[in-house]
């Protein structure tokens, strides 16, 4: 019995020591990796081009790029804007459900001047 416990402990230590670094398998995913939800991505944007397309982590939208203000499902057709930008566009309940509320990323500080 003691030998089994020692073997189990050694096995657990070996698995814990061999665990990958900061690059994740389920969370902390880099751009281009397959994702199921935006919370898995370092960039916080999991995007797919079509409803049947494979979703991948990608960078957030830059200024004057198409964007989605929010998603109900955690996967975007267009990523939200980078920090400091706002997604200006039409918003509707149907668009929120179908994930088609698109806009353009604008710098609100620059547009007020």
Curated annotation (Swiss-Prot):
Principal localisation: secreted
Record propeptide residues: 19-23
Disulfide bonds: 35-46, 41-57, 45-79, 67-87, 81-105
Tissue: Expressed by the pancreas.
InterPro entries membership: CLPS_chr, Colipase, Colipase_C, Colipase_CS, Colipase_N
Localization of this protein: Secreted
Function per UniProt: Colipase is a cofactor of pancreatic lipase. It allows the lipase to anchor itself to the lipid-water interface. Without colipase the enzyme is washed off by bile salts, which have an inhibitory effect on the lipase. Enterostatin has a biological activity as a satiety signal.
Record has Ribosomal protein as a keyword: no
Keywords of this entry: Digestion, Disulfide bond, Lipid degradation, Lipid metabolism, Secreted, Signal
Protein name: Colipase
One annotated GO biological process: digestion
PROSITE patterns: COLIPASE_1, COLIPASE_2
One Pfam family per UniProt: Colipase_C
Similarity-based family: Belongs to the colipase family.
Entry GO MF terms: enzyme activator activity; lipase binding
GO cellular component, as recorded: extracellular region
Organism: Mus musculus (Mouse)
Range of residues in the leader sequence: 1-18
Gene: Clps
Quaternary structure annotation from Swiss-Prot or TrEMBL: Forms a 1:1 stoichiometric complex with pancreatic lipase.
């Amino acid at each position: 019995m003691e030998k089994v416990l020692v073997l189990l402990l050694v096995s657990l230590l070996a698995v814990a020591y061999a665990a990958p670094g900061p690059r994740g398998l389920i969370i902390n995913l880099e751009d281009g990796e397959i994702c199921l939800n935006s919370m898995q991505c370092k960039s916080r944007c999991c995007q797919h081009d079509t409803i049947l397309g494979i979703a991948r982590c990608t960078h957030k939208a830059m200024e004057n790029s198409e964007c989605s203000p929010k998603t109900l499902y955690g996967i975007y057709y267009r990523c939200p804007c980078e920090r400091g930008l706002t997604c200006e566009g039409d918003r509707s309940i149907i668009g929120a459900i179908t994930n088609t509320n698109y806009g353009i990323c604008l710098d609100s500080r620059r547009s007020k001047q």
